[in-house]
Every structure is written in structure tokens, then in C-alpha cells.
Amino acid sequence: RYDSIRDSVFRAHPWNCLIRRQDLAQSSTNPTFGYAHQYPLPTDPYCLRVLEFSNGSMSYPQDNMKNNSGGPAFVIEGRNIVTDEGTAKIKYVARITDPNEYDSGLIEALSMRLAAEMAYAITGSTSMVQITTSAYDQSLKEARFVDSTEGATRRIEASDFIEARY
């Protein structure tokens, strides 16, 4: 049960300590229809959630990439990315099993989620479940905020919409 709870907390936010980048190797089998290429998702470390997809010159979601027919630039099917792009690079949330690599906020959130999951079995109290679930929600909120504000801030480019306000 620990593994599924851990993975759920990992997928809840793009934690900086869990983000990895990788060039994907094209599969020897192509999709039957719809897209030209297929790329297996990374297994070492295991990919839990794709955050960005790039063909080397454009990225999704930043450049709002589309395929030649105007559809999505890529689709995740099972443990594969299918796309028309001949090159595939991704930024993803990885399953990191060494807790020494976790941010302190992530550790706190994961601990609170585990406490919420075990509360009834240990205490037999539904109010304790509510208390620990609320504590998890609060710790997750705080950890996400701190994690998302670390590092360089993204510059918002001026557009006609933004310029119209001034």
C-alpha cells in the first residue's frame, strides 16, 4: 500500500526533487494508426507523469504543439507516447525511492497522507480520519506552494491581452 500512496502524492504535484529529463528512444513497433511513432516511457527512473514533451525545437505545453492534422502533438497510451514527431524529449515526474532525495515539504505531505490512510485502522475513530486528512490537505498545500516558488520565476511575455490593461 505504501508504494501506491507514495506514487499518488508524487503525481499530485511536479515536485522539483522528482523531476527528470530524458531523450526517448523510438520503439521498433509503430502505432497501427493515428500517429507515426511510438516511444516507451522511461523505466529507470520510472515515469509517473509527463510534464513536458519536446521535439527538440518546440515544446508542449509552452508552444501549444499540435500534430499535422491539428490534433494533440502526443498522446500517452499505456506506457508509451505516440506522436508524429521523429524526436521525443520529455520532462517528467520520476518515481524516486530514496527518501534522502525528497524535499522536506514532500516528506511532510507523504507522512500526513500515510497517517490519514492508517488513522481508522489504528484508532477506530472517524474523527481522527477527518483530522489527519485535513492535516494532509494543509501540508500538501504548503509544500506545493514552497516547491512551486523555488528557482527561477517564469517571465510572462507581453501580449495584446496583457498590454490592453495598461
Segments from the language model and where they lie:
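Glycine-enriched, solvent-exposed interface loops adjoining structured elements
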Residues: 1-166
